[in-house]
Amino acid sequence: MASEIIVDHQQKAFELLKLDAEKILKLIRVQMDNLTMPQCPLYEEVLDTQMFGLSREIDFAVRLGLVDENDGKELLDRLERELSALHDAFTGK
């Protein structure tokens, strides 16, 4: 029973982190589509702030034992790759 609760908390924690990563991606898509260019300091500031916040969330979940460190790194890496591809598509690279 206790191990089922732990697994459930781990799954919920990772799902919440994935949702936060998706929110960052959506925010950047909206910003690129409607508001600013990727070279804009505001764009860079928003992206840096959001990515830093997510990395701190992941670190906290890892320290609590809710998320495996490698899974957390993979989540950040995947988001960075998606953001890079989005940036390249927007700038025509």
Swiss-Prot record:
Superkingdom of source: Bacteria
Family classification: Belongs to the UPF0358 family.
InterPro entries attached to this UniProt entry: UPF0358, UPF0358_sf
HAMAP family: UPF0358
This protein's name: UPF0358 protein RBAM_014700
Organism (species): Bacillus velezensis (strain DSM 23117 / BGSC 10A6 / LMG 26770 / FZB42)
